[in-house]
């Protein structure tokens, strides 16, 4: 399998690490104005996508040295998939509502689509067990409460009137994410052991 050879190549891993590191930094900078008005207790839960890429960056750093970090791997897989898909859908929804999308919207579609894909591509290398996925699942679902009960969700001014529908969609996206993460990791391990 040629793609696995590429995914394991140290040079490729280093480039991917640097892309994710700079993407994480850019992502936190993108959230700067929202973080400035966020109560301290919620700060860790507001910058969803940069936090997801941060988890993946940490995974890549350890993976470069042939180490596994299952809790980080579970958080990376679930958050990359969920927030990657979420941002793509929200930007397409913005395009539908407004009839137009600026260059940043298209950049977010491409970069967040890539986030979701990279999390899935590395699934065969994760050492995730049920306890690791349970922690990541709690993180995802707890984040829904923070976002949609306490109003800390990312600010998309043009979509504000659809917050209830977006919250409902996001909850089910989390459930789908947990299912996909299980099937790609624990489910595959069960197949190999059978």
Predicted region positions:
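N-terminal membrane topogenic signal
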Residues: 1-17
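Membrane-interface helix-boundary motifs at transmembrane edges
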Residues: 3-8, 63-76, 124-131, 187-191
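Alpha-helical transmembrane segments of multi-pass membrane proteins
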Residues: 17-34
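A glycine-rich, hydrophobic loop/mini-helix early in the fold
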Residues: 32-98
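Non-cytosolic membrane-interface motifs at loop->transmembrane helix junctions
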Residues: 38-45, 98-110, 157-166
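Hydrophobic cores of alpha-helical transmembrane segments in multi-pass inner/ER membrane proteins
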Residues: 51-63, 113-124, 169-185
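Membrane-proximal helix-loop-helix units in multi-pass membrane proteins
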Residues: 76-143
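Terminal transmembrane helical module of multi-pass membrane proteins
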Residues: 127-194
């Amino acid at each position: 399998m040629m793609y696995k050879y590429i995914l394991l190549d140290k040079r490729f891993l280093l480039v991917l690490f640097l892309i994710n590191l700079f993407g994480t930094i850019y992502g936190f900078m993108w959230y700067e104005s929202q973080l400035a008005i966020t109560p301290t207790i919620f700060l860790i839960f507001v910058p969803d996508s940069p936090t997801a890429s941060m988890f993946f960056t940490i995974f890549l750093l350890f993976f470069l040295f042939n180490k596994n970090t299952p809790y980080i791997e579970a958080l990376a897989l679930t958050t990359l998939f969920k927030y990657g898909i979420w941002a793509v859908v929200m930007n397409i929804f913005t395009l539908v509502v407004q009839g137009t999308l600026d260059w940043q919207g298209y950049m977010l579609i491409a970069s967040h689509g890539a986030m979701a894909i990279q999390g899935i591509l590395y699934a065969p290398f994760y050492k995730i067990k049920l306890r690791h996925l349970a922690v990541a699942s709690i993180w995802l679902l707890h984040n829904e409460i923070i976002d949609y009960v306490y109003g800390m969700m990312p600010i998309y001014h043009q979509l504000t009137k659809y917050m209830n529908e977006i919250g409902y969609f996001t909850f089910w996206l989390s459930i789908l994410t947990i299912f996909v993460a299980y099937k790609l990791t624990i489910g595959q391990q069960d197949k190999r052991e059978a």
